[in-house]
Amino acid sequence: MSMIARWHFQAKFGHKQEAIALSKEWDEQIGKQTDLDFDGTRMLSGSVGAKEAEVQVEFEIDGLDELQTFFDKIASIKMHEDWGKRMGEVIVSGSTYWEVFRIVD
């Protein structure tokens, strides 16, 4: 069953481009160390009717087991911990969360 996993964060004022750059860096350096295919990853940014600071990263997964395997894998990558500290400097603390959607059509 195909699903969309979407990670949300809000950039601190004046740091949105830096947060986006760090997210792209994560895709290239850390995401590629996982078994997920990040070629179809999309990054969305708040515009009309959404918070301007909002950034969302979404990618397709086969199911919740694949997402859990992904979480387990990134937890074991030292570079992910270091990246998280840098990302924490440019995003609003407590603003990150995940959503998962089923693809129905």
Where on the chain are the PLM-derived regions?
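Short glycine-enriched loop/turn motifs at secondary-structure junctions
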Residues: 3, 49-53
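An amphipathic, aromatic/His-enriched active-site/gating alpha helix that lines ligand/cofactor pockets
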Residues: 25-42, 50-51, 58-97
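Long, low-complexity, Ser/Thr/Gly/Pro-rich intrinsically disordered segments that act as flexible linkers
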Residues: 96-105
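Short, surface-exposed ligand-recognition loops at beta-strand->loop->(often short) alpha-helix junctions
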Residues: 12-22
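Pocket-edge positions in alpha/beta enzyme catalytic cores
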Residues: 11, 56-59
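Feature marks short, surface-exposed loop/turn motifs that line or immediately flank catalytic pockets
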Residues: 13, 63-65, 104
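Active-site-flanking beta-strand signature of metal-NTP-handling nucleotidyl enzymes
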Residues: 2-10
